[in-house]
């Protein structure tokens, strides 16, 4: 297994994480006007934690996985988009998708300017591993299924 950081695009790896006042302030929650939050407590006046710390800690405990190895997203579309955006250089890399499958793989590849190579399932819906290997030898960066 490769070290995953070696697969990440260089410009993505060098990004500085977005920081909010909430990240920097550890005391009693005040009013975060820089985040355009409502100063009046009505139950919906705060944005949720952008790092999902509490949720990841709970999932970590339940599943026995380190919280830094857990990704939480806004559904599969976001996860697919991020995988292609993080690991594939636009107009350079390609990805492999098994077909028939979820249509968002193709849409996300087009949005990220990544060539998508589709490999058809066998007639019995088995994975054509030899075809996947052959297509993957020509510079595929990601296999999505």
Which residues does each PLM region occupy?
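N-terminal "arm"/small-domain region of PLP-dependent enzymes with the aminotransferase-like
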Residues: 1-62, 145
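Conserved beta-strand segments of alpha/beta enzyme cores
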Residues: 11, 29, 69, 115-117
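CheY-like receiver
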Residues: 21-24, 83, 87, 131-135
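Hydrophobic residues at beta-strand termini and immediately following loops
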Residues: 33, 47, 73, 117-119
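Short glycine-rich anion-binding loops that position phosphate/pyrophosphate groups of nucleotides
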Residues: 36-39, 76, 102
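Short beta->alpha linker loops
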Residues: 50, 71-75, 100
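Phosphate-binding glycine-rich loop
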Residues: 56-94, 112
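PLP-dependent aminotransferase-like
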Residues: 89-145
């Amino acid at each position: 297994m490769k070290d995953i950081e070696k697969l990440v695009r260089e410009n993505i790896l060098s990004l500085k994480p977005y920081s909010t006042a909430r990240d920097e302030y550890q005391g009693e929650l005040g009013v975060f006007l820089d985040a355009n939050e409502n100063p009046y407590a009505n139950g919906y006046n705060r944005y949720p934690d952008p790092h999902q710390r509490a949720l990841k800690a709970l999932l970590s405990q339940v599943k026995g996985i380190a919280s830094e190895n857990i990704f939480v997203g806004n559904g599969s579309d976001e996860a697919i988009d991020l995988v292609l955006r993080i690991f594939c250089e636009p107009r350079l890399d390609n990805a492999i998708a098994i077909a028939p499958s979820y249509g968002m793989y193709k849409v996300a590849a087009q949005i990220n300017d990544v060539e998508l190579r589709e490999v058809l399932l066998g007639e019995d819906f088995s994975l054509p591993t030899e075809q996947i290997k052959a297509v993957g030898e020509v510079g595929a960066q990601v296999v999505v299924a």
